[in-house]
């Protein structure tokens, strides 16, 4: 199979398996194999054209090669092509076509495709809105460990969209997503523990999740965490850290954070303010 050999030569040059990577040489071999009908090469060539690796960016040609690979059943090509249709990259935006190709990839167990398809069913984009179908695809993607799908599934269970509200099950998925670093899931968990939704209030656990979300730059989490430090709720009282987090929240345009920062400063020594400002400079530069 000469197309297979051409594709392998492309991979060798692309990844530098035996030599230094040579993207332009890789594209040459990918194109030869792609013209011979090899789906993997068509996909690899499309990726190169989309990213401008070893060639000039050409989104229209990338769409053409993704389409040829997708029609041969290449799951990643189907997923990428769906994204091109969804965002109007290299082709006119078409939500129905996006749904079609996401569905093909989703049926081949591509977790991100399952999640995106779920979102399109939930929103009614390119397909009739159907919460049951949205849940189905979110569940499949969540079961594969995709944190975005775990969060979306939790939100639907929490709100009772298409199913009876089930906070207990929602919490399972919020936790799964939060443990993987999903900022919105971390913030939502913090609010659930803070308000005692379906459980006793636990400000210590709320503070734990607030810290994680705040570190990921969720402004509302930063604001609440700052207030926790100011009042010693769930964490030891610490005016310096209160000032730092009010400052972080203020940098996102939250006026109340700027006001609260000034109030916190009234309780602080000049040395504490200087320390807080230095920490803030380090934080904001990071």
What kind of feature is each model-predicted range?
Residues 2, 38, 74, 110-112, ...:
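Residue-level recognition of tetratricopeptide repeat
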Residues 188-191, 195-197, 204-215:
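Alpha-helical adaptor scaffolds
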């Amino acid at each position: 199979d000469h197309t297979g050999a051409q594709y392998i030569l492309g991979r060798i040059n692309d990844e530098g398996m035996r030599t230094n990577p040579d993207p332009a040489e890789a594209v040459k071999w990918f194109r030869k194999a792609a013209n011979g009908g090899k789906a993997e090469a068509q996909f690899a060539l499309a990726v190169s054209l989309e990213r401008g690796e070893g060639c000039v960016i050409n989104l229209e040609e990338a769409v053409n090669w993704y389409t040829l690979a997708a029609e041969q059943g290449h799951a990643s090509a189907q997923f990428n092509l769906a994204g091109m249709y969804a965002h109007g990259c290299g082709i006119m935006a078409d939500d129905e076509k996006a749904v079609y190709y996401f569905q093909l990839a989703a049926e081949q167990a591509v977790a991100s495709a399952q999640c995106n398809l779920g979102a399109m069913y939930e929103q009614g984009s390119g397909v009739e809105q159907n919460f049951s179908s949205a849940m189905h695809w979110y569940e499949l993607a969540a079961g594969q460990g995709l944190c975005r799908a775990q969060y979306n599934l939790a939100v639907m269970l929490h709100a009772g969209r298409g199913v009876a509200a089930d906070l207990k099950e929602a919490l399972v998925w919020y936790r799964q997503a939060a443990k993987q670093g999903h900022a919105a899931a971390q913030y939502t968990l913090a609010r659930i523990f803070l308000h005692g939704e379906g459980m006793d209030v636990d400000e210590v656990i709320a503070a734990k999740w607030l810290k994680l979300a705040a570190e990921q730059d969720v402004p509302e989490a930063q604001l609440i965490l700052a207030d926790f430090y100011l009042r010693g709720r769930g964490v030891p009282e610490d005016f310096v850290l209160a000032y730092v987090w009010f400052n972080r929240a203020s940098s996102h345009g939250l006026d109340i954070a700027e006001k609260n920062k000034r109030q916190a400063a009234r309780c602080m020594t000049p040395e504490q303010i200087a320390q807080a400002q230095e920490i803030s400079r380090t934080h904001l530069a990071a």
